Amino acid sequence: MKKLKSALVKCMGPLYNVLFKTRIENRRLIKEMKQLTAEKEYLNYQVNYLKHHFDIGQMKPATGVLREYQLAEVEFARYILDLLKPYEIPMYLEGGALLGAKRHKGFIPWDDDIDIAMSRADFNKLLHVFKTDSNFVWIDTTQKSGYYAEYYDKLIRANANKNVVIMTPTCVHVFNGTCLRDSKNLEFFPNDFLKEEVTEEQYLAFRDKAIAFIRVPHTWKELFDFYEATWKECGLFSLEPTSRIVPGLGNWDLTEYGYHGFRHHDDVYPTTTILFEGKKLPCPNKAEAILDREYSKSWRDYPKDIGFPLTLDDKNKYFEMIGEPLINYKEF
């Protein structure tokens, strides 16, 4: 019996040592976790304290590379809009650009693009201008292949320092630069007038079916053909003004944003102008009403994505993929 007990102790000794060390390590990890939790709560309190006492509209503009990019973007936007001025196409700031104009008198400090929207009839007119005006280089994107950022990069390089128009399934880009890295970009989006007799239920049923088709992988040509055929066949939309406006087929908002109700014609038209980084840009008639509907009253408060410029992040994903240096837009 003594020999058996001795053998068991001898065999179990290493296991006891492991268990003892594990217990000590677990205690250390628990202590560290408590410290990290306390630090997180402390930082959360500090952030919430600043948010409570600091008006986001008074936030300083971006600095460094991001600020340089923003100012180049607004100069480019004004340049393109001046080229389009003779065509008298009513258009207006959309999305984050409109929010930035109202809340910051320019860019949201961490934003990096400018979105412009217009009615379907005006969007069709804009496409005709892009195809026929010698100030622009229209690209046939129906045969697009490959990763979208690589595709943009190739087309910009092939048309260096020209206003390259690239129609995608979610917007129309106008790029200018020598490559994607140094290019400026302005984006245009179509909105549609909804016929007066169409009910909200009918529109939402159409919207769900359209989104279901769009989110399944398709070639760009298949999507363009779907937009054209569906717009004509559904019978929901009007080229003439009506009292209600919705994101159009070919508008990023249709698939990526939730439904927030209809926009009212009088909230959008007649369009006006607003100061954006010291430049006059086109604006909806009642910008705050538009923003209240799109974002609720929370557009005046702090969002969840603070600090991250999405366009530059997208570019960096491409540069990482091809082994090029990333754009360091961080300010500190």
Task: Please report, for each region that a protein language model flagged, where it lies by residue.
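Short hydrophobic/aromatic-rich motifs at helix boundaries and adjacent loops
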Residues: Y49-F54, G96-A101, T242-S243, Y259-H264
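Short N-terminal signal/transit or membrane-insertion segments
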Residues: E25-Y49, A97-K102, D112, P190-I211
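Active-site nucleotide-donor binding segment shared across nucleotidyl transfer reactions
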Residues: L81-I114, M118
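Helical scaffold of the NTase/Pol beta-like nucleotidyltransferase catalytic core
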Residues: K34-E94
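Conserved catalytic core of two-metal-ion nucleotidyltransferases
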Residues: A62-K85, L127-Y295, R300-F332
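Boundary detector for helix-to-coil junctions that initiate low-complexity/charged tails
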Residues: M1-Q46, H53
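Helix N-cap motif at beta-to-alpha junctions
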Residues: R120-F123
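Tryptophan-centered motif/residue detector
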Residues: F54-D55, Y92, W110, T170-H173, ...
